[in-house]
């Protein structure tokens, strides 16, 4: 067997990736290329995610309260005024149960909100996560030491939660520098 035939048999035995020419790729995939995520767009998406999480918290809190109220009202419990639950009368205990269910439901809201946000922005999700990691490292690097806070010198937004635009980020950096200058005096 010749060396060329041996090479071709080895090449056929291994799976290879077939790459189309660059011209065909750009024609074929020109409309599906993801748009790079700018800082302005990232901060807008971050604000939108916070809004979605807030609305989802309200919705799940109300929904679990309604479900708890439905369960308590439909349950075949013999609730009389003389019944005592945890030292409280039955109606007070039922009301506190509905409030507790609403509170637990509102804690579930951000998880559902995150799923909704991820589903609506699935194309930009990987770029969003990378930008968020980069953004949080910037915040961690530039944040101030809260040990030196006082009533006249409060800590400026320690976690950067109020940053919604590049203008807000620059203002946050100026506030951090102002805090550090006031600390040194």
UniProtKB/Swiss-Prot annotation:
Transmembrane segments: 52-72, 84-104
Transit peptide: 1-29
Top-level taxon of the source organism: Eukaryota
Example of a GO cellular component annotation carried by this entry: PAM complex, Tim23 associated import motor
Cellular localisation: Mitochondrion inner membrane
InterPro entries the record matches: Pam17
Entry membrane topology: Multi-pass membrane protein
UniProt entry tagged with the keyword Ribonucleoprotein: no
GO-annotated biological processes: protein import into mitochondrial matrix
Keywords from the named record: Membrane, Mitochondrion, Mitochondrion inner membrane, Protein transport, Transit peptide, Translocation, Transmembrane, Transmembrane helix, Transport
Subunit-structure text: Component of the PAM complex, at least composed of mtHsp70 (SSC1), MGE1, TIM44, PAM16, PAM17 and PAM18.
Family: Belongs to the PAM17 family.
Biological role stated in the UniProt entry: Component of the PAM complex, a complex required for the translocation of transit peptide-containing proteins from the inner membrane into the mitochondrial matrix in an ATP-dependent manner.
Protein name: Presequence translocated-associated motor subunit PAM17, mitochondrial
Source organism of this protein record: Yarrowia lipolytica (strain CLIB 122 / E 150)
């Amino acid at each position: 067997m010749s060396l060329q035939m041996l090479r071709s048999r080895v090449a056929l035995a291994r799976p290879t990736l077939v790459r189309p020419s660059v011209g065909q790729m750009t024609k074929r995939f020109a409309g599906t290329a993801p748009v790079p995520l700018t800082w302005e767009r990232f901060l807008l998406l971050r604000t939108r995610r916070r809004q979605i999480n807030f609305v989802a918290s309200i919705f799940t809190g109300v929904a679990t309260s309604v479900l708890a109220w439905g369960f308590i009202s439909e349950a075949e419990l013999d609730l009389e005024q003389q019944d005592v639950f945890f030292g409280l009368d039955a109606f007070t205990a039922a009301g506190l149960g509905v409030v507790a269910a609403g509170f637990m439901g509102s804690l579930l809201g951000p998880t559902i909100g995150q799923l909704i946000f991820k589903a609506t922005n699935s194309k930009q999700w990987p770029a969003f996560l990378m930008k968020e990691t980069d953004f949080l490292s910037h915040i961690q690097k530039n944040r101030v030491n809260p040990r030196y806070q006082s009533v006249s010198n409060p800590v400026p937004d320690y976690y950067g939660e109020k940053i919604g635009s590049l203008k807000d980020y620059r203002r946050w950096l100026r506030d951090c520098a102002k805090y550090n200058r006031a600390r040194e005096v």
